[in-house]
């Protein structure tokens, strides 16, 4: 172990240009203890050497160091060094040093009872400990002591410097990971008040001069402070984990070594194998000049028991140290367990000494970052105070972006108080001087405000005026005059002039001059007991201005209020106590009771049962520095405020229109929390209240409140007749700023209605006045002067019943606010009366209805009478326009359907509605199918008219030939979107397709135009008058017309008196005669008219969406005839889905889309093998009457004989998604087979069938097999909503059927048909069979049969794929059931359809 002199920096002692090698940071590790083997021997020798030289060192400080021969040599045990060059050089360098003798590691002697101090002096530095051996680890080595004494002031030799360098080399060469880090709980700072390796006596140490010390475990080595003057200046702050204090000495002027922050610290460790190795370190005092005091031996602390409490005590000692320099402080806290406990050093720019930041007076490292030049206490008289870096005085805030994203802006400071408190305290916020009146309590009466200008500004009743003393019955001065009357005449005269003061004698219950009763000595604890200790109270966090997540109990709040010390500032401002024991002990001021509108108009029977707004008594409990930001009391109510304890400071902003606008903008601003509203309005007044003061705050005044000290306040809110206009204005602001309902005045609207009823009840309008106003809209009731002048000499004395009678005095402020009250209640009456009012939801309408009390008559009639009452009382003015008879009734009213409440109904209501709708639709369909043909003809005949034939190839222009019923205006002119399924958000404006593509939607406008101007629905022929039955019947009639082929048979002129038409006339008539047909514009060749353009889909209702079918219901669950007429939307490509072979019998798979097909039923091909084309009217009759076999025989004969040439369907033109095209190819009709028989496919599923879900197309693959393809709404569909739809047209000439080979010569791209009706064309007089395209499916492979059963039996394979020559044969062979009796089939199909539609259905899957 080297002596302490090796660390002394001697100026000029080193060779010229000699540079001490600096080990890299993190490479220097603490010196390890030597082995235990020969520690005892070595310590004994050191003690002998020290005892022999101690006196000499003390007396001759300049003597030479002991020679190497004086130091007993011992070998290095346990240093298993590697053969590195650095180790070799270091060993050689150490060998040249006479004092750097290898230390033997010996355990402590049992006879040694000297202890080392655990708490070293503050001014003593520390010495570097011995180097730790590589191979051994012995905790007892930390107590080793040096035996060599040395002179403090003598300059060291060159060998000392070289020895230091060698030690550095050794430290550099030593590994840094020999031992794991030792917990800080075992770290100890020990005394090092000795400079040699012996335990010195107190007398020896007293005579020594203390200088700079270094900590090596618990030993200090003295350094010469005077030798530091030539060291280069260096003022750096560095992090140290304590190992720096072990690795390098604290030499004045040099930077402390902080490179070993990751090395294990020196600490006293327990030995598991020995229990007697507890080293009691003697507590040694600070060496100040030459005096050191030792602690008693019995005051030792075992090193093994030292832990965290010891460190805390050391920290406290260091914090409380009066020493200015850590060069003399050995309370070195060197935590190294983690970086959070690192100790920061700072250097003095004056003396260049290093200090721990705590010793320098800094709390943490963050404070040192602002230091420019640090000056220790010793240097301050010479160098001045510590300087800091320049910091801007501008206020900066750190934004909590997470909170800001949620709309909550929090204060960035660490202060517990609100961020406005400090500026207010420092008067940084300027306020205008206030001159609000201070009034005596006897002057504050209702009469004062009613007969004046009302209560327009805050009023303060000082505590010195509002006492509890009784008022004497007479004036003391008058009593003195009476007693001093010299004569009887004078006495009588005084009695005659006795002041007529009417004093009310009341029971003394502790009331003050305002007649307000509040228990004296009320405290927060008492409030807690009276209200209920376990009752909940809402607590406000002042800093965030938001309520706590959970309500506190009154017990918890009382404990918080009475607690002292730093705490989060919280406030209670919404504790209403009227229904508690405390509420029965309080009485409001008389002025408040007289002006309270609620007390005047609320029914007594409701008050008796406790059903009234409870806002009369609020107990406000605030700790110091509470702050409530600017607000207006709910409903524009007025406030009374009495300070029981503490102080309050108000900041008032008058309720001018510009200020209210600023207030509304401020409330909606995201920077509300950090924007002082007073700075925005430029008009803000400050009012300070003390204990006992009472304040009245008028309606609408914007105010904030600061609590300078703990306070207890009793207050309350009340509405008045004097502030109708302001109260209603504030209520509207609350609505605009979206104030939650729980923070609004309860039953505000109901109180206003009760006020109106009170006016009309106590002072009814005479009949003569009502008649005069009703007869003449310009009538004015003449008054000589306003009625608010009628007091005193002008008091009203007219008898009751007179037009000029007043039941009471009406103030000017009250009369001026009545028009605002009438307008406000008129709107509520219109809403309750189901009139159209903008921006009113169903929930709002229901709430308004509940807010209107029971009254004689309708609310609209009552408010109309009140309008006349206002004109009568105000006088000399006309009544409002809306009071005229019939004006209100002329406004639009909601329809019966629109009166239904919005929002998603409950599951139970949904089920009930679905069951009722399903039952009604079933009944309607069953009645329609069972009605005899005669009845239907009787019902429909009176309304039918012949339709004039149109010109050839010209589209129909009107539908005047069909009786048009009177439809709901909303249904015909306004698009009705389906319910979104939830009550959240506005209704969708765009269709789903455009909304998903995020483009502007024009489909709703087109749909509106089409439905409003061109769509006419014929329901008069149904014979049923119930809405559900009519809807169901209408849908069935339309679909029945589609099922019939949607064309006209040539020669069926006997039906309903219709003459035989040519092809174009039949086409036009087929559209016009369709019950739900759609008229087309002139020049529009598409049968769909406007519907041929791309359109999005409205969202289906819940029932249809769950059952996965196209929805034709409106938003109220009824069948929408317009939706029933719309064409279905394309779903998927022809290869999307293929039904399984065994599922071909699934009846509903063919009828999946009816939206567009029912709109234009004529644009549908009909297969000659199944049915003959006939008019939709005829088909409808045949469906309704069940007579399906009357006309097909006639048509078959016509087909056999041949018909005029007409346009036939080509294979590529069956898709409704294709534009209309005319085909010129002719087909010989003589080749048509004569086996075409009855129109079996004449029945369709109801509008809610599966026909609106999938499109089934029969296709022929390469092998000739027929494959049914199911189309679903897939985005991969070729004919998507983004592409124009193409629909076939009809030409007057007839396509003659050719051979199968000829049909293959017209290859066309396969196009899908969305529905059986959409891909089918009608040829008058011709039963056009389907043509087969050899290797490609025909374009008429759509769902050609509107009856699923018939389609699967007759069309799916045979008709659509067989050529004309093989048509009948293929139909016979594959579907022999096509000749089933149509009557039985129709009845069976209806039942089957209903089972599919309203029961559980099985969808066709993939093949």
Curated annotation (Swiss-Prot):
- Cite the record's Basic and acidic residues compositional bias ranges: 55-67, 125-140, 896-914, 928-938, 1254-1264, 1285-1296
Cofactor(s) listed: Fe(2+)
Q: Where is the composition biased (Polar residues)?
A: 141-150, 1008-1027
Judged by the first EC level, this protein's enzyme class is oxidoreductase
InterPro entries assigned to the protein according to its UniProt record, in alphabetical order? JHD, JHDM1_Histone_Demethylase, JmjC_dom, Zinc_finger_PHD-type_CS, Zn2Cys6_DnaBD, Znf_FYVE_PHD, Znf_PHD, Znf_PHD-finger
Which Gene Ontology MF annotations are present? Answer: DNA-binding transcription factor activity, RNA polymerase II-specific; histone demethylase activity; histone H3K36me/H3K36me2 demethylase activity; transcription coregulator activity; zinc ion binding
How is its cofactor bound, per UniProt? Binds 1 Fe(2+) ion per subunit.
Q: Which residues form the JmjC domain?
A: 577-735
Which segments show compositional bias classed as Low complexity? 1273-1284, 1297-1349
Biological process terms from the Gene Ontology for this record are: chromatin remodeling; regulation of transcription by RNA polymerase II
Residues bound to Fe cation are: 631, 633, 703
> Is Transcription among the key words of this record?
yes
Q: Which Pfam families match?
A: JHD, JmjC, PHD
Instruction: For this UniProt record, give its keywords in alphabetical order, as a comma-separated list.
Output: Chromatin regulator, Dioxygenase, Iron, Metal-binding, Nucleus, Oxidoreductase, Transcription, Transcription regulation, Zinc, Zinc-finger
Decide whether keyword Zinc-finger is in the record. yes
Per the record, its GO cellular-component terms are: nucleus
State where the protein is found: Nucleus
Q: Where are the zinc fingers (PHD-type)?
A: 323-382
Binding of substrate: at which residues? 628, 648
Which PANTHER family does its entry note? Answer: PHD/F-BOX CONTAINING PROTEIN (PTHR23123)
Q: What is known of its domains?
A: The JmjC domain mediates the demethylation activity.
Protein's job: Histone demethylase that specifically demethylates 'Lys-36' of histone H3, thereby playing a central role in histone code.
Name recorded for this polypeptide: JmjC domain-containing histone demethylation protein 1
What is this protein's gene name? jhd1
């Amino acid at each position: 172990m080297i002596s302490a002199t090796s660390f002394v920096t001697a100026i000029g002692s080193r060779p010229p240009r000699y540079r001490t090698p600096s080990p890299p940071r993190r490479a220097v590790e603490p010196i390890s203890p030597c082995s235990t083997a020969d520690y005892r021997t070595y310590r004994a020798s050191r003690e002998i050497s020290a005892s022999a030289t101690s006196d000499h060192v003390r007396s001759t400080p300049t003597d030479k160091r002991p020679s190497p021969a004086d130091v007993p040599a011992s070998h290095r045990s346990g240093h298993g060094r590697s053969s590195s060059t650095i180790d070799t050089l270091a060993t050689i360098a150490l060998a040249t040093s006479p004092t750097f003798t290898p230390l033997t590691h010996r355990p402590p002697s049992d006879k040694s009872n000297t202890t080392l101090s655990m708490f070293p002096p503050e001014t003593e530095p520390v010495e570097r400990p011995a180097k730790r051996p590589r191979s051994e680890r012995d905790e007892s080595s930390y107590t080793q002591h040096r035996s060599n004494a040395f002179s403090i002031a003598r300059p060291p030799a060159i060998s000392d410097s070289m020895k230091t360098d060698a030690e550095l080399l050794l430290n550099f060469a030593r590994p840094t990971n020999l031992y794991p880090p030792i917990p800080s709980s075992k770290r100890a700072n020990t005394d090092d008040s000795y400079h040699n390796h012996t335990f010195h006596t107190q007398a020896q140490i007293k005579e020594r001069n203390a200088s700079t010390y270094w900590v090596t475990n618990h030993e200090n080595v003295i350094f010469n402070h005077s030798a530091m003057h030539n060291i280069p200046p260096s003022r750096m702050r560095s992090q140290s984990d304590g190992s720096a204090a072990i690795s390098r000495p604290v030499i004045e002027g040099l930077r402390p070594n902080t490179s070993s922050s990751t090395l294990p610290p020196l600490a006293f460790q327990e030995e598991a194998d020995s229990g007697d190795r507890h080293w009691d370190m003697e507590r040694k005092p600070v060496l100040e000049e030459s005096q050191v005091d030792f602690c008693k031996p019995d005051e030792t602390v075992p090193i093994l028991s030292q832990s965290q409490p010891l460190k805390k005590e050391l920290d406290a000692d260091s914090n409380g140290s009066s020493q200015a320099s850590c060069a003399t402080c050995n309370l070195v806290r060197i935590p190294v367990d983690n970086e959070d406990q690192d100790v920061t050093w700072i250097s003095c720019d004056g003396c260049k000494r290093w200090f721990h930041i705590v010793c320098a007076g800094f709390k943490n490292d963050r404070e040192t970052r602002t230091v420019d030049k640090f000056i220790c206490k010793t240097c301050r008289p010479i160098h001045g105070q510590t300087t800091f870096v320049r910091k801007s005085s501008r206020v900066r805030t750190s934004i909590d972006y997470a909170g800001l994203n949620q709309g909550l802006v929090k204060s960035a400071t660490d202060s517990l108080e609100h961020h406005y408190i400090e500026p207010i305290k420092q008067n940084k916020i300027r306020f205008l001087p206030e001159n609000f009146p201070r009034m005596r309590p006897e002057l504050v009466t209702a009469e004062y405000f009613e007969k004046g200008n009302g209560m327009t500004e805050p009023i303060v009743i000082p505590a010195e005026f509002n006492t509890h003393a009784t008022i004497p019955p007479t004036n003391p001065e008058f009593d003195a005059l009476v007693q001093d009357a010299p004569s009887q005449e004078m006495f009588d005269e005084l009695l005659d002039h006795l002041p007529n003061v009417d004093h009310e004698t009341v029971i003394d219950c502790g009331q003050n001059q305002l007649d307000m009763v509040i228990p004296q000595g009320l405290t927060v604890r008492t409030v807690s007991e009276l209200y209920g200790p376990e009752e909940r109270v809402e607590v406000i966090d002042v800093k965030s201005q938001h309520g706590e997540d959970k309500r506190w109990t009154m017990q918890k709040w009382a404990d918080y209020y009475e607690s002292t010390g730093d705490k989060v500032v919280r406030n209670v401002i919404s504790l209403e106590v009227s229904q508690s024991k405390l509420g029965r002990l309080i009485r409001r001021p008389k002025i408040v009771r007289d002006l309270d509108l609620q007390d005047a108009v609320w029914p007594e029977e409701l008050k008796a049962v406790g059903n009234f707004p409870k806002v009369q008594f609020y107990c406000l409990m605030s700790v110091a520095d509470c702050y409530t930001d600017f607000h207006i009391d709910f409903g524009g109510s007025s406030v009374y405020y009495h300070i029981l304890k503490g102080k309050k400071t108000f900041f008032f902003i008058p309720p001018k229109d510009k200020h209210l606008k600023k207030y509304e903008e401020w409330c909606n601003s995201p920077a509300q929390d950090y924007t002082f509203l007073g700075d925005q309005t430029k008009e803000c007044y400050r009012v300070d209240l003390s204990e006992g003061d009472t304040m009245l705050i008028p309606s609408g005044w914007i105010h904030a409140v600061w609590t300078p000290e703990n306070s207890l306040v009793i207050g309350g809110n009340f509405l008045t007749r004097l502030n109708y206009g302001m109260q209603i204005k504030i209520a509207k602001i609350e609505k605009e700023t979206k104030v939650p309902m729980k923070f609004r005045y309860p039953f505000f609207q109901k109180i206003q209605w009760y006020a109106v009823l009170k006016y009309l009840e106590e002072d009814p309008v005479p009949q003569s006045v009502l008649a005069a106003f009703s007869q003449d809209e310009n009538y004015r009731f003449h008054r000589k002067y306003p009625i608010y002048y009628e007091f005193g000499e002008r008091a009203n004395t007219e008898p009751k019943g007179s037009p000029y009678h007043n039941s009471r005095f009406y103030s000017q402020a009250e009369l001026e606010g009545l028009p605002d009250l009438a307008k406000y209640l008129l709107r509520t009456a219109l809403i309750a009366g189901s009139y159209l009012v903008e921006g009113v939801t169903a929930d709002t309408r229901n709430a308004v209805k509940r807010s209107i009390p029971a009254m004689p008559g309708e609310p609209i009639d009552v408010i109309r009478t009140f309008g006349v009452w206002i004109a009568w009382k105000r006088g000399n003015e006309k009544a409002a326009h809306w009071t005229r008879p019939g004006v209100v009734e002329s406004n639009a009213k909601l329809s019966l359907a629109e009166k239904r409440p919005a929002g998603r109904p409950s599951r139970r209501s949904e089920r009930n509605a679905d069951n009722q709708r399903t039952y009604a639709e079933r009944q309607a369909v069953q009645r329609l199918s069972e009605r005899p043909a005669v009845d239907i003809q009787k019902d429909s005949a009176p309304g039918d008219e012949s339709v004039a034939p149109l010109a050839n190839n010209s589209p129909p222009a009107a539908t005047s030939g069909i009786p048009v019923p009177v439809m709901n205006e909303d249904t015909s002119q306004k698009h009705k979107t389906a319910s979104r399924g939830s009550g959240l958000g506005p209704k969708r404006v765009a269709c789903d397709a455009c909304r998903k593509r995020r483009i502007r939607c024009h489909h709703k406008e087109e749909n509106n135009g089409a439905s409003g101007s061109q769509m006419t629905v014929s329901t008069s022929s149904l014979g049923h008058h119930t809405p559900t039955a009519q809807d169901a019947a209408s849908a069935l009639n339309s679909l029945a017309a589609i099922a019939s082929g949607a064309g006209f048979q040539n020669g069926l002129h006997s039906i309903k008196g219709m003459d035989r038409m040519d092809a174009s006339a039949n086409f036009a008539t087929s559209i016009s005669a369709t019950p739900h047909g759609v008229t087309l514009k002139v020049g529009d060749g598409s049968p769909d008219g406007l519907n041929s353009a791309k359109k999005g889909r409205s969202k289906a209702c819940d029932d249809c969406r769950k059952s996965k079918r196209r929805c034709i219901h409106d938003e109220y669950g009824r069948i929408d005839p317009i939706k029933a007429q719309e064409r279905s939307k394309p779903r998927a490509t022809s290869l999307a889905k293929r039904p399984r072979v065994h599922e071909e019998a699934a009846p509903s798979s063919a009828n999946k889309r009816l939206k567009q097909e029912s709109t234009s039923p004529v644009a549908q091909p009909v297969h000659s093998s199944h049915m003959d084309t006939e008019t939709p009217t005829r088909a409808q009759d045949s469906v309704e009457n069940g007579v399906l076999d009357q006309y097909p025989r006639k048509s078959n004969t016509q087909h056999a004989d041949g018909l005029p040439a007409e346009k036939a369907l080509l294979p590529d033109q069956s898709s409704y998604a294709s534009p209309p095209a005319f085909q010129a190819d002719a087909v010989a009709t003589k080749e048509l087979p004569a086996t075409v028989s009855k129109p079996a496919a004449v029945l369709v599923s109801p509008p809610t069938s599966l026909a609106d879900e999938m499109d089934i197309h029969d296709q022929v693959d390469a092998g000739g097999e027929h494959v049914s393809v199911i189309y679903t709404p897939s985005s991969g569909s070729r004919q998507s909503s983004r592409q124009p739809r193409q629909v076939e047209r009809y030409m007057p000439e007839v396509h003659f059927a050719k051979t199968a080979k000829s049909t293959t010569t017209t290859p066309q791209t396969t196009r899908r048909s969305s529905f059986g009706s959409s891909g089918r064309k009608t040829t008058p007089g011709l039963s056009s069979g389907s043509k087969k395209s050899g290797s490609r499916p025909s374009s008429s492979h759509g769902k050609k049969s509107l009856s699923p059963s018939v389609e699967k039996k007759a069309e799916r394979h045979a008709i659509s794929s067989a050529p004309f020559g093989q048509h009948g044969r293929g139909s016979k062979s594959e579907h022999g059931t096509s000749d089933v009796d149509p009557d039985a089939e129709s009845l069976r199909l209806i039942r089957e359809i209903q089972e599919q539609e309203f029961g559980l259905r099985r969808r066709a899957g993939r093949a």
